[in-house]
Structure formats: C-alpha cells, structure tokens
Amino acid sequence: MSDIIKQIEEEQMKKDVPAFRPGDTLEVKVWVIEGTKKRLQAFEGFVIAIRKRGLNSAFTVRKISNGEGVERVFQTHSPIIDSITVKRRGAVRKAKLYYLRELTGKAARIKERLN
C-alpha cells in the first residue's frame, strides 16, 4: 500500500524547485484567482523556515510591507506556485529564523553568503 502512495506522491511533486536555505531571499510567483480573473502575484521576502516532508513540504517567507511584517507559508509542490526564484543567498547559522520576528531595522538584516 505505501508503495502506491509513494508512487502517486512522486508523480505530483515538482521537479523545477530550486535549492534554497533559510536566510535566502526568494521571489515566489503565485496564481491568484479573483472572481473570474486569474493573475500572477509576486511575493518577495526571506525564508525563515523550511519543512521537508516530501509532497507535504512547505516553507515560510517573511517580508516587511509598509512597516508591517507579513509572513506567508507556501506548500513547495503546490499547483498555485508558478515559479520560485532565489534573489540572494543569506548566511545564517540556524534552521528556523523565528527570532527575526522580534527584530526591527538594521538588526533584522541578514548577511550575504558568498559561496
């Protein structure tokens, strides 16, 4: 039974997901449906958490919009995600960057990874 589930999950997983880590700045383009119209919306911010669970994988992106922190959790293999682009690589030493929620201004910056 579990072989059938694994096979179905592998078929539904996206192959074009770029490699990214917490601290990286991403631009996620998402399909938004408003009434009968369908359009692409970009959400750009840095990754504060990644959950790797095969088809159920997810990542959390945080950005500051008009002085307010906005976080959005994306399912990695969701059909509403059109593309994921890595804009900048960040150098951090933790897997979960929840402590950045409390920081503001220059303290909330992430250094750039050079490699």
From Swiss-Prot:
Which InterPro entries does UniProt cross-reference here? Ribosomal_bL19, Ribosomal_bL19_CS, Ribosomal_bL19_sf, Translation_prot_SH3-like_sf
Pfam families linked: Ribosomal_L19
Annotated GO biological process: translation
Q: Which GO terms describe its molecular function?
A: structural constituent of ribosome
Q: Which UniProt keywords apply?
A: Ribonucleoprotein, Ribosomal protein
Gene3D superfamilies registered for this protein in UniProt: 2.30.30.790
- Gene Ontology cellular component terms for the protein in this record: cytosolic large ribosomal subunit
Function of the molecule: This protein is located at the 30S-50S ribosomal subunit interface and may play a role in the structure and function of the aminoacyl-tRNA binding site.
Report the family membership.
Answer: Belongs to the bacterial ribosomal protein bL19 family.
Query: What name does the UniProt record give this protein?
Result: Large ribosomal subunit protein bL19
UniProt organism field: Hamiltonella defensa subsp. Acyrthosiphon pisum (strain 5AT)
